[in-house]
């Protein structure tokens, strides 16, 4: 058993008509992982588990395998992403109740220029292929400044 700070991210494809399109969101706490991984990334950085989570061994963050778009087939804004986090905490997704949106810094750790995956439109995104194809191309984050929320993109431009 390893005790680790887990960060569960929901790659949530989001869309705000007034602002921008986004596609991911996440969550944090300290829990124990009891199971063995069912799959490991080619560089051994990520481990996938049967409960629908992916562990980043470098950052000790745990992410949800599927994003909001993949699970709900719907667009969400930042407020809806936060409401969804509450719902999955209430349901104790994967046995955890401390999910949250990632910070900009945390979400940025998923972007790796040498990694390849495809988003819901079949376009190239730069996250590990252990994450299922068809996800969104960016993520909502917990970071805010006045009335603005920050997004991290996984497309060519990468980052914030």
Each model region followed by its residue ranges:
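Glycine-aromatic-enriched surface loops/turns that form tight recognition elements
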Residues: 2-7, 15, 19-100, 104-160
């Amino acid at each position: 058993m390893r005790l680790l700070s887990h960060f569960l991210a929901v790659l949530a494809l989001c869309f705000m008509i007034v602002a921008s399109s986004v596609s991911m969101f996440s969550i944090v706490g300290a829990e124990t992982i009891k199971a063995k991984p069912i799959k490991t990334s080619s560089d051994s950085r990520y481990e996938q588990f049967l409960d629908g989570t992916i562990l980043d061994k470098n950052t000790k963050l745990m992410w949800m395998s599927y994003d909001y778009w993949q699970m709900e087939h719907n667009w969400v804004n930042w407020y809806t992403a936060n409401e969804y986090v509450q719902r999955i905490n209430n349901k104790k997704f994967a046995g955890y109740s401390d999910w949250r949106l990632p910070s900009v810094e945390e979400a940025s750790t998923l972007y790796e220029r040498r990694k390849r995956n495809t988003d819901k439109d079949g376009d190239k995104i730069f996250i590990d292929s252990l994450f299922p194809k068809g996800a969104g191309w960016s993520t909502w984050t917990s970071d805010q400044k006045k009335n603005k929320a920050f997004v991290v993109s996984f497309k060519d431009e990468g980052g914030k």
